[in-house]
C-alpha cells in the first residue's frame, strides 16, 4: 500500500486519468504472456468517457469557442459520454443540455440531472438520429449554444493519444505486444 499522501485537487477534473493497470493473473494463468487491464472505472465518474468529456470541453475553451457562464453546451448522447460531459460542465461552470433517446436507463438520467444537466428525451424509435436532430434544433435556437459533436470531434480520440496510451506504455515499462479495446465514437 502506498504511504504517500495524495495532494488535494483544485477541482474534480484534476483527478481524470492516471488510472492503474493490473495484471489479470487468473485470466492469463496458462498463457505464455501477461494480460493487464487499465482500470478506467477508477475515473471520477467510473468511466473512460470522463477523459473525453473533459478533453472536448477543454479543447473548445483553448480555441476560444466557449466560455464558462456564457456558453450553453449541447450534445446528443446515449451513454457515459453525457455523464463525462455533465460532470466536467458542472465543475467548469457551464450549462449543459443533453438530448437522448427515452429508452436510456433511469439511472443514467438521474446522474445527468444530479450534475445539473438539462435532459431532453427523444423518441426511442428514432434512436440516436432523433437525439442528434433534436440537439441540432436546440442549437439553432440557443444564443451562445455550442455542440461538442462527439462523433466528429478530434478532441474525443485525441485524449487517448495524449494520456491513455502513454499511461499504458509507462505503466507496462514499454512492454506492450498487443492491445484490445472496444471502439464506438473513438472515445473509448
Curated annotation (Swiss-Prot):
The modification N6-(pyridoxal phosphate)lysine is found at residue 49. Its cofactor is pyridoxal 5'-phosphate. Its main location: cytoplasm. The keyword Transferase applies. Pyridoxal 5'-phosphate binds at residues 80, 184-188. Keywords: Amino-acid biosynthesis, Cysteine biosynthesis, Cytoplasm, Lyase, Pyridoxal phosphate, Transferase. GO terms for biological process: cysteine biosynthetic process from serine; response to zinc ion. GO terms for cellular component: cytosol. One of its GO terms (molecular function) is transferase activity. It comes from the Eukaryota. CDD domains: CBS_like. InterPro entries: Cys_Synth/Cystath_Beta-Synth, P-phosphate_BS, TrpB-like_PALP, TrpB-like_PALP_sf. It is found in: Cytoplasm. Belongs to the cysteine synthase/cystathionine beta-synthase family. This is Putative inactive cysteine synthase 2. It comes from Arabidopsis thaliana. The gene is OASA2.
Amino acid at each position: 500500500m502506498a504511504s504517500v499522501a495524495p495532494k488535494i485537487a483544485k477541482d474534480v477534473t484534476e483527478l481524470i486519468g492516471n488510472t492503474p493497470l493490473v495484471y489479470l493473473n487468473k485470466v492469463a494463468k496458462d498463457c505464455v504472456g501477461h494480460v493487464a487491464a487499465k482500470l478506467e472505472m477508477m475515473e471520477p465518474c467510473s468511466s473512460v468517457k470522463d477523459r473525453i468529456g473533459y478533453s472536448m470541453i477543454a479543447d473548445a475553451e483553448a480555441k476560444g469557442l466557449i466560455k464558462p457562464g456564457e456558453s450553453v453546451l449541447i450534445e446528443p448522447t446515449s451513454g457515459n459520454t453525457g455523464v463525462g460531459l455533465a460532470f466536467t460542465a458542472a465543475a467548469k461552470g457551464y450549462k449543459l443540455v443533453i438530448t437522448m433517446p427515452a429508452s436510456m436507463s433511469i439511472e443514467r438520467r438521474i446522474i445527468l440531472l444530479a450534475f445539473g444537466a438539462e435532459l431532453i428525451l427523444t423518441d426511442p424509435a428514432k434512436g440516436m438520429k432523433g437525439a442528434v436532430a433534436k440537439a441540432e434544433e436546440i442549437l439553432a435556437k440557443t444564443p451562445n449554444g455550442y455542440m461538442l459533436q462527439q462523433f466528429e470531434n478530434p478532441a474525443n480520440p485525441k485524449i487517448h493519444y495524449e494520456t491513455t496510451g502513454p499511461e499504458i506504455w509507462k505503466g507496462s515499462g514499454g512492454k506492450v505486444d498487443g492491445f484490445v479495446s472496444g471502439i464506438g465514437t473513438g472515445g473509448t
